């Protein structure tokens, strides 16, 4: 398929998939079907017995049942297949340390055994896996309600907001009180004035891919965090998973797009008009970012400001504006919005050195125990994965600045 036609089709299909109007219509249809049949509002929960996130999610089931007029069906499921979780060993290690920190933040004690009455024998796991697949997912710790999936504690606020909007809360919130949820999304503290560094300024290492929707959500916040706390910023580009030989099956891609859309709405960011940059567009983008980082080095910029501007412009173009970075005009638009001209674009595309840099960054990321993006770390503190963990990054910055203990939850 010609690249230009592919970009057009990508914009159209992604726009339809992430359309708020179509999402709201689907929700109304589910609600109408429930009312016409007189059935209960059913929340299906997929519990993976050996999953730390499932241990946390299961701990809030009694709270959800007490707060909402819903029937909860709990199904045991096996771990995701390799196509959905291609680096299982690192996923397990990351999940264990991340879930401990997440539990401390929310003040939730994880269950040490499956929910009462849940069968976890081989046949039950197989039935749960079949139901999960039929409903369109692949992970544990997943809540499914009337056509939409919500992952663990991190998306519980979206689920509860929807339940409350449907009038399913047993005790509705007072007018103007806002939505009260069991695990509110963490917020950044933005301490003012920020603490002064103890000697050397901390450095944020940011592992970035240009095909990651979640990276688009993270990059602006991360840039502002570094500036606010006076941290240096090292931008480390890596190729997307699918361009590193790691599969990304359709159910996973679909969930990521839909989840990114609702998170983008919460953060006030545009998202949904997508020109998928997989392949040559991403390679051209990384070349341009590396050229910008070389300019930063010459100019003595310790915050990677030009490289960050190019990466942010690329991500906005790919995921919010539908700009085809595979075309000369598209890449030039991206460059110009970041302050670079056509000569810089030509120089960047003539230099293939970015490939060795991206590979070195990939190996560094793996050595830190992670494989996906967005990932980041402060100095030599453990690396973090996911735009939902920016609050932990801020905690680590405060630790480096001498204002908090490691893993602080305040």
Regions found by a protein language model. Name each.
Residues 44, 49-50, 55-123, 216-318, ...:
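Structural alpha/beta surface segment adjacent to cysteine/selenocysteine redox centers
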Residues 36-43, 197-204:
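A short, charged/proline- and glycine-enriched loop
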Residues 13-16, 54-65, 119-194, 200-205, ...:
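C-terminal cap of thioredoxin/glutaredoxin-like
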Residues 48-49, 209-211:
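The substrate-binding groove and active-site-proximal loops of carbohydrate-active enzymes
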Residues 31-35, 69-73, 130-132, 193-195, ...:
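Short hydrophobic/aromatic-rich motifs at helix boundaries and adjacent loops
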Residues 1-30, 35-37:
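N-terminal leader/targeting and pre-domain segments
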Residues 26, 30, 34, 44-47, ...:
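A near-ubiquitous, low-amplitude feature marking generic local secondary-structure context
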């Amino acid at each position: 398929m010609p690249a230009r036609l592919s970009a057009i089709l990508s914009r159209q299909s992604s726009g339809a998939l992430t359309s708020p109007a179509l999402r709201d219509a689907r929700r109304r249809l589910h609600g109408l079907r429930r009312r016409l049949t007189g059935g209960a509002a059913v929340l299906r929960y997929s519990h993976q017995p050996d999953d730390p996130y499932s241990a946390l999610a299961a701990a809030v089931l009694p709270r959800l049942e007490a707060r909402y007029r819903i029937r909860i069906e709990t199904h045991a499921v096996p771990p995701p297949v390799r196509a959905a979780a291609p680096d299982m060993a690192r996923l397990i290690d990351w999940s264990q340390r991340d879930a401990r920190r997440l539990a401390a933040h929310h003040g939730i004690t994880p269950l040490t055994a499956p929910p009462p009455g849940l069968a976890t024998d081989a046949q039950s796991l197989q039935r749960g896996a079949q139901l999960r697949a039929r409903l369109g997912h692949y992970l544990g710790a997943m809540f499914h309600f009337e056509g939409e999936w919500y992952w663990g504690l991190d998306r519980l606020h979206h689920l509860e907001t929807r339940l409350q909007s449907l009038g399913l809360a047993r005790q509705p919130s007072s007018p103007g009180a806002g939505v009260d949820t069991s695990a509110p999304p963490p917020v950044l503290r933005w301490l003012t004035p920020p603490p002064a560094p103890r000697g050397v300024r901390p450095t944020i290492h940011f592992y970035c891919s240009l095909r990651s929707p979640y990276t688009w959500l993270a990059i602006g916040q991360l840039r502002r965090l570094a500036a606010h706390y006076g941290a240096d910023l090292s931008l480390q580009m890596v190729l997307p998973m699918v361009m590193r030989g790691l599969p990304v099956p359709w159910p996973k891609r679909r969930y990521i797009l839909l989840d990114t859309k609702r998170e983008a709405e919460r953060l006030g960011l545009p998202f949904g008009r997508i020109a998928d940059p997989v392949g040559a567009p991403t390679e051209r983008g990384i070349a341009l970012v590396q050229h910008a980082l070389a300019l930063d080095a010459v100019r003595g910029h310790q915050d990677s400001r030009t490289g960050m501007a190019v990466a942010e412009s690329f991500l906005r173009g790919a995921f919010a504006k539908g700009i085809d970075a595979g075309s000369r005009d598209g890449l030039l638009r991206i460059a110009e919005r970041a302050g670079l001209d056509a000569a810089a674009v030509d120089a960047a595309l003539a230099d293939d050195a970015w490939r060795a840099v991206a590979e070195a960054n990939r190996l560094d990321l793996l050595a830190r125990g992670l494989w996906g993006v967005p990932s980041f770390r402060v100095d030599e503190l453990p690396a973090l994965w996911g735009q939902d963990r920016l609050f932990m990054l801020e905690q680590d910055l405060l630790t480096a600045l001498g204002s908090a203990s490691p893993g602080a939850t305040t």
